[in-house]
């Protein structure tokens, strides 16, 4: 067992190794099973050292994380600047940086900056150039269309064309789309040749709405899946009254289901978060879980949850209790 895990693994079993490198779909990019999301880096963090982006990225590197995700929208460029600065001491060939396009910051800096939707060919090129400047890097590895929910025609037309040109010319290694819905991602899978998808919140222990259509398409077409929102806005971190699901207060129905999942986990002496973060890896299309954190402590907890020894009986109970569809793969083949 690698020394870096001896302090965070229960027993001698390691169900999921956060540092394991996996090829991302049909692309030539490999990502660590645990990836670091830069969403929180666009907001104010704890003032002490543990809360700094540099400390979080350093600890992530020690754990074995090599895939780092950001976007212009996160803090209106602040996340990209912080991620670029924090990764500057690591060799470019050893790290994987992903960012997103589809929103230009106008003006590019200053107190009046606002995000402006733009999935045009020129808009994509400008967005990437500005992201590279903010991060002070020459290139990124993965480039996603960011939440094109109301912009299908432009994103799938000129936007996709721009991404394809960037991939073909070697400016980026992989192209994808990141969304909080699965229906449009399934359409991208059918009508384009994207390499990967960032699926946020739609393939989790609580919500498997991507299972029926999107996930089979990804398996069939070798599209790598990056899972975001594994705790569904916090409800799978603690399903208490007032918990959030999909960025808003959870309905009684979602809260009740999350509490049933928590009860199954409690019977098997397993944290709900451990089951939640390990669940997606049972699907063959899933390469990595992307998790945003605000402190080194949160990062270490995610690594512990990923490496926790989840009993096989827990997965069987989840199936028996009807908490996932019969067609849903579970760890260990249960």
Enumerate the predicted regions with their spans:
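Active-site groove signature of glycoside hydrolases
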Residues: 132-151
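A short, structured active-site edge motif that brings together acidic residues
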Residues: 94-106
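Conserved, mostly hydrophobic/aromatic
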Residues: 24, 36, 68, 83, ...
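Short, acidic/polar
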Residues: 47-60, 119-135, 180-187
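N-terminal binding-site loop/beta-alpha segment at the start of enzyme catalytic domains
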Residues: 1-95
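Active-site mouth loops of central-metabolism enzymes
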Residues: 39-51, 110-123, 152
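Surface-exposed, active-site-proximal loop segments in enzymatic domains
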Residues: 105-118, 241-245
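Beta/alpha (TIM)-barrel catalytic core signal, keyed to glycine-rich beta->alpha loops juxtaposed to Asp/Glu
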Residues: 3-13, 18, 52, 148-334
């Amino acid at each position: 067992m690698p020394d870096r895990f001896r302090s965070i693994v229960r027993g001698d079993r390691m169900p999921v190794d956060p540092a394991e490198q996996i090829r991302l779909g049909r692309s030539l990019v490999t990502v660590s099973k645990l990836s670091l999301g830069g969403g929180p880096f666009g907001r104010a963090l704890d003032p002490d050292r543990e809360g700094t982006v540099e400390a979080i990225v350093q600890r992530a590197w020690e754990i074995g994380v090599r895939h780092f995700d950001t976007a212009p929208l996160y803090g209106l460029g602040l996340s990209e600047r912080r991620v670029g600065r924090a990764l500057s001491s690591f060799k470019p060939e050893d790290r994987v940086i992903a960012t997103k396009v589809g929103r230009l910051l106008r003006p590019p800096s200053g107190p009046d900056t606002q995000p402006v939707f733009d999935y045009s060919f020129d808009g994509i090129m400008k967005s990437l150039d500005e992201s590279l400047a903010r991060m002070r890097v020459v290139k990124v590895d993965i480039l996603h269309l960011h939440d094109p929910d109301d912009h299908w025609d432009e994103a799938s037309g000129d936007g996709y064309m721009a991404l394809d040109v960037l991939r073909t010319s070697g400016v980026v290694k992989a192209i994808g789309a990141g969304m909080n819905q699965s229906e449009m991602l399934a359409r991208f899978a059918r009508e384009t040749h994207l390499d990967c998808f960032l699926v946020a919140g739609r393939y989790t222990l609580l919500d498997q709405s991507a299972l029926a259509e999107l996930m089979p398409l990804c398996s069939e077409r070798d599209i790598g899946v990056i899972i975001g929102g594994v705790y569904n806005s916090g409800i799978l971190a603690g399903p208490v009254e007032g918990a959030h699901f999909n960025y808003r207060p959870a309905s009684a129905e979602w809260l009740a289901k999350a509490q049933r999942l928590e009860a199954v986990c409690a019977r098997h002496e397993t944290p709900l978060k451990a089951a939640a973060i390990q669940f997606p890896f049972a699907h063959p299309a899933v390469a990595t879980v992307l998790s945003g954190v605000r402190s080194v402590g949160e990062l270490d907890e995610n690594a512990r949850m990923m490496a926790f020894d989840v009993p096989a009986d827990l997965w069987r109970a989840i199936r028996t209790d009807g908490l996932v569809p019969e067609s849903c793969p579970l760890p260990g083949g249960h």
